[in-house]
Each structure stands twice: as C-alpha cells, then as structure tokens.
C-alpha cells in the first residue's frame, strides 16, 4: 500500500500532509558529517553504495520523513557521458573537458558509472518501510548543460547561454544527448526500486521566456513522457527553480505529475495559477528553517493553508542549509504533523 507521499504525488488530497526536505541527507546532520569525514571526498561517498544508502536513510531514521531521496548528485549524468568529475574543497564541482573547448562527440561514454547508483537505490529500498516513499532524481538537461559547457558552476551561465544563442543546433545536440541519458538513468533508478522521481532544474531562472520554452519545457516534457510511458505508476516531480511566472506554463506543458515551487513564489499565487488538483511541493524559505522561532511557525502555517485545497507535499523552496539546527527541523515537523485542514 502506498505511503502518504506517494498517494499525494499520485493526486490524492489526503488528510495527513506528507513532508520531506530537499538535501535532507546532508551536512546539517552530525551523523552525515561523521560518515563524510570517514569516507573522504564527496564522490567517494556517492560511489560507496553502503555508505550512500546509509546517508539516504539517516534523516528517515532521525525524523521519520515521508520520503527518502537518493543520496547522489546531478552531475553523475555528465560523468557517465564521459566527462571527468571532481569536487574540489571550497570550489565546488569541476567537469573536463568542458564543452566550450571540446566537441560533444569527443566524449567517450562510461555507462558503468551509473551502476553503483542503482545498487544504492536497491539497498535503500530494502531498508525502508512501505510507508516511506523512495524518490530517485536527476538534473534536468538545461541545468546539467550549464555545468557541461562551462566546466563548473557560474553566476549567470553566460557561457552556456551564449553558446545556445550562437550555435543553437550544437546546443540542441547537447540537450538531446543529456535527455536520452537521463531517461535511461531514471529508468534504472525505477527498476532498482525508486517509487517517484524528481527533475531538478536548478538554473532555469536564468532563461528568457522563449529560451525557457526550448531548453527547459521541451526536454523536461520528453523525459516526463518517456517515464510515464514506461512507468505510469511512478510520479514525476518537476522543480524549475527560479521559473517565477513561467512556472504556470511549465506545469501545463511538461506533463509532469507534480510541480515544485521555490520560496520566491507566493504560495497563494501558485495555488491560484497552477492547474487545479495538480500536486504541488514546497515552498518554505530554507532561511526560515535556519532561523526558527515564531516566524517559522507563522510561515509554515501560511504554506499549509495556501495549498489546503489540493494535493500538497510540504518541502522547502530549495535545499536545507548546512547550519540549520536540528531542533528547528524537529519544530517544523511538529507544526506540519499537528496541522489539520
């Protein structure tokens, strides 16, 4: 029998509001920091399937969230496509060769780099109760492309946007390649035990409306369609962070089952503008969770009330901050669990 999170993502408006938090497996947890120190680098932790499974389950064990999300990274896809991936202390991820300097067809795919991720999914699934939904995920093509082209994160994605304008056919080939690998990657996660999927388009907010249609909506629609044809029982959550008013078109045109809302969007606007009865996920500001206090309770209740008339998964507007106090997460859970329509 599906748990409350899966029921909600499938379109049921149930009395108990399910909750999980983006980056819930991470540095704010002392048990995570201990294991990370033991394993060394971030990528080593991701590829140690026992350790990655343990990290995925840690927040479930501590807080009893309704969903466990796979501990991994969106850049596993370009790593499998043949780029070298390094996480440097204080600098973030680096990919090479960057596609500003090398042709896409020069990359030699290493599909075996995906297999350990599937093993982690299976190991997590074996540890969860039926009530806890296991979510897999991938980065959406635009966001992944920004790293593949520039070789690292950037503030305004200047290099990637310029390439898309200068040579749209070459950039389309990059988007298409990422899309195809992502479909297979997500399929592997479902086959290993994932019950729902999230597409993270973390940098969608850097695009103008026409480019948003081409580089965000279109490839996400291809992925959602492929997954629904293969696995109609597995809901897909689309999260185009920073989309703003373009979120409404995203929700209507991509075919995702549920849509994630970031903290910059008024929940009352989202409740009014998004398709009726479409499951929504979000959208508490992570800084409120960091700060705690009466304002945390007030704003949490505001989100709960705004989405009371549709299926809603309580979450943050983006990932939990590493300095968030454990007691604030416990307080949030108490508020959400204690609230009733």
From Swiss-Prot:
Q: Which sequence ranges form a coiled-coil region, renumbered to this chain?
A: none
- Primary location recorded for the protein, binned into one broad class: cytoplasm
Record's PROSITE patterns?
UROD_1, UROD_2
Q: Known EC number(s)?
A: 4.1.1.37
What keywords were assigned to this record? Cytoplasm, Decarboxylase, Lyase, Porphyrin biosynthesis
Record carries keyword Nucleus: no
What GO biological process terms does the UniProt entry carry, in alphabetical order?
protoporphyrinogen IX biosynthetic process from glutamate
Domain of life, per lineage: Bacteria
Under catalytic activity, the entry for this protein gives:
uroporphyrinogen III + 4 H(+) = coproporphyrinogen III + 4 CO2
Residues with site note (Transition state stabilizer): 73
Task: Report whether Lyase shows up as a keyword of the record.
Answer: yes
User: Where is substrate annotated to bind?
Assistant: 23-27, 73, 147, 202, 318
Its quaternary organisation is: Homodimer.
Name listed for the protein in its UniProt record? Uroporphyrinogen decarboxylase
Species source reads Novosphingobium aromaticivorans (strain ATCC 700278 / DSM 12444 / CCUG 56034 / CIP 105152 / NBRC 16084 / F199)
Lineage at the top is:
Bacteria, Pseudomonadati, Pseudomonadota, Alphaproteobacteria, Sphingomonadales
